[in-house]
C-alpha cells in the first residue's frame, strides 16, 4: 500500500473472523459505496478496488487475538510521480499486465469529481463514507482519551 497526503486511509475493525469473510465484507461495502457515487468500481484480486480498470484502493488485513483489522487506502489526489518512484515493480510484471508504468494502472478518485458532489474534495468523500460506514458518533470521555494516548505512546516507543 502507498500512502501520502493525497489519499484517504481507512481502518475497519471487527470481531476476529475468517480472513476471506472479513475482506469480503469490507471490500463489498467499499465497492458498493463507490458505485453509489456513480463510479464503475469492482473488486480485483483479493484486496484491490478498481475504477475503469485502474486501481484506486489497496487493502491489507491484520489479525489480533480477538479482532480483525482491515487497513486500506483510497487514492484521492495522490502525487503520481512520487507514487511511481516509490513503487517500482519489475518491468516483466508491468508487461504481463500490458502497461508501461505504474501510472497507467492507478487513478485518483478526484479525476471523477464532476460525477458526484461527494467526490469534490477529500472532506466530502470522507463525510459520505462516514455516513454510510458508521451507526453514529461516539464521544469519548477524558479517561478513554488518556488510555488511547497511553496505548499509542507505548506503541510508538516499540
Write out the residue ranges for each language-model feature.
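Active-site cofactor/substrate anionic-group-binding motifs, chiefly glycine-
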Residues: 1
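Short, amphipathic alpha-helical segments
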Residues: 4, 17-28, 43-44, 65-68, ...
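Generic signature of intrinsically disordered, low-complexity segments enriched in small/polar residues
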Residues: 5, 15, 26-32, 79, ...
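A generic, well-ordered mixed alpha/beta core segment in the N-terminal half of proteins
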Residues: 6-56, 60, 73
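Long, positively charged amphipathic alpha-helical accessory segments at protein N-termini or as interdomain linkers
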Residues: 37-38, 57, 65-158
Amino acid at each position: 500500500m502507498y500512502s501520502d497526503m493525497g489519499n484517504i486511509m481507512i481502518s475497519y475493525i471487527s470481531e476476529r473472523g475468517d480472513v476471506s469473510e472479513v475482506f469480503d465484507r469490507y471490500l463489498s461495502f467499499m465497492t458498493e459505496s463507490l458505485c453509489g457515487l456513480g463510479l464503475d468500481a469492482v473488486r480485483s484480486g483479493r484486496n484491490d478496488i478498481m475504477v475503469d480498470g485502474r486501481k484506486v484502493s489497496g487493502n491489507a488485513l491484520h489479525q489480533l487475538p480477538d479482532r480483525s483489522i482491515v487497513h486500506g487506502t483510497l487514492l484521492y489526489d495522490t502525487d503520481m510521480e512520487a507514487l511511481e518512484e516509490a513503487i517500482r515493480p519489475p518491468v516483466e510484471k508491468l508487461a504481463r499486465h500490458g502497461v508501461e508504468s505504474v501510472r497507467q494502472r492507478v487513478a485518483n478518485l478526484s479525476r471523477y469529481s464532476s460525477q458526484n458532489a461527494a467526490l469534490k474534495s477529500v472532506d466530502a468523500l470522507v463525510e459520505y463514507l462516514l455516513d454510510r460506514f458508521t451507526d453514529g458518533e461516539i464521544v469519548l470521555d477524558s479517561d478513554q482519551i488518556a488510555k488511547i494516548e497511553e496505548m499509542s505512546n507505548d506503541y510508538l516507543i516499540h
